[in-house]
């Protein structure tokens, strides 16, 4: 069942069966990616493809994030693979719920709200037992690449194992103190540039600076001449995981046609290493970065996306400041724009 939400010229759709947001349009822009096989019958009927991949689109909430080698859920957990229950949906806001029996009947409530250029989400997690990883999973596609900007990070790292063996640009199992990752060929890659000219499948984890009160990632798309700003509460989501999917997956349903895609996956996890590893002492927990969320109490996870036209000449953000209902975006040149943003969302 598809639920429509509207505010002014903004329109979003929540797919209750898939748990994702396959449509978000605002001002003629469509910031989110939709997999090309989403409506292909042969993929939808394939029992070997997880539901989250069959209906891959937009943004969805993963719990647990990635591999669940504790409870045995499919990749990204029941919140990304099982139907949601609608509690209320009217106008610009929808509220939905999902229950996780294998995690002590933990309940996840999802609130989606459209306000101007922003798509706001809150996830309220209640009850349950044990520890769990989680992350948002918004995806954007770039026809001709783009430029990325980030809030301050104190580390960048890659997983010990590749997403698709032999198809990674970045060297495995590295930890860096800047945004320049070592590559398999001995060179370096600036994470602020999407690797549009490389057929690769890559993944890295960025660790938020300790003093950040607002975490953000900005993608400026070249061909589309727009920008997507993704905002997070860094206290709840101390890492940003970047998924690069640019044609390297040559097996069904991907078949080398999933190109130019970037996942901006803010959450609490040990990269792509699975729930069991995240629940143990690990290299992130050694940095005092939590990699799991303890169930059994109420947690509120706040996230937002803002879609804007890219001002002429802009290529990189140097700062994003939220104050009194206004987001101020500063470009590397010093130029600024102010964008209204709902007060209280990140309080």
Predicted regions and their residues:
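Surface-exposed acidic/polar loop and edge beta-strand patches at domain peripheries
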Residues: 1-120, 131-347
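Asparagine-centered strand-capping/turn motif at beta-strand->loop junctions
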Residues: 124-128
């Amino acid at each position: 069942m598809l639920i429509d939400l509207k505010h002014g010229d903004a329109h979003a759709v929540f797919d209750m069966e898939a748990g994702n947001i396959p449509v978000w349009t605002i001002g003629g822009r469509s910031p989110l990616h939709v997999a090309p096989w989403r409506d292909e019958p042969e993929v939808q009927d394939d029992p070997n493809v997880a539901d989250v991949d069959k209906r891959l689109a937009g943004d969805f909430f993963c719990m647990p994030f990635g591999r669940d080698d504790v409870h045995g859920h499919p990749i990204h957990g029941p919140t990304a693979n099982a139907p949601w229950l609608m509690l209320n949906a009217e106008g610009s806001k929808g509220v939905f719920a999902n229950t996780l029996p294998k995690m002590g009947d933990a309940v996840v409530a999802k609130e989606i709200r459209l306000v101007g250029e922003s798509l706001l989400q809150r996830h309220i997690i209640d009850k349950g037992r044990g520890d769990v990883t989680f992350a948002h999973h918004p995806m954007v596609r770039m026809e001709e690449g783009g430029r990325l900007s980030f809030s301050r990070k104190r580390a960048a790292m890659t997983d010990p194992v590749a997403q698709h063996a032999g198809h990674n640009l970045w060297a495995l199992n590295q930890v860096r103190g800047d945004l320049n990752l070592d590559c398999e060929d001995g060179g370096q890659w600036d994470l602020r540039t999407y690797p549009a000219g490389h057929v690769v499948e890559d993944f890295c984890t960025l660790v938020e600076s300790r003093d950040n009160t607002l975490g953000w990632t900005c993608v400026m798309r070249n061909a589309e001449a727009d920008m997507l700003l993704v905002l997070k509460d860094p206290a709840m989501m101390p890492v940003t995981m970047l998924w690069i999917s640019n044609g390297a997956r040559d097996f069904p349903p991907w078949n080398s046609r999933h190109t130019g895609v970037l996942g901006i996956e803010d959450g609490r996890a040990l990269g792509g290493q699975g729930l069991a590893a995240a629940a143990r002492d690990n290299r992130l927990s050694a940095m005092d970065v939590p990699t799991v969320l303890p169930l059994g109490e109420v947690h509120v996870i706040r996230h937002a996306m803002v879609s804007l036209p890219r001002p002429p000449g802009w290529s990189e953000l140097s700062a994003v400041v939220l104050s009194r209902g206004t987001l101020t975006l500063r470009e590397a040149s010093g130029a600024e724009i102010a964008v209204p943003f709902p007060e209280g969302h990140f309080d």
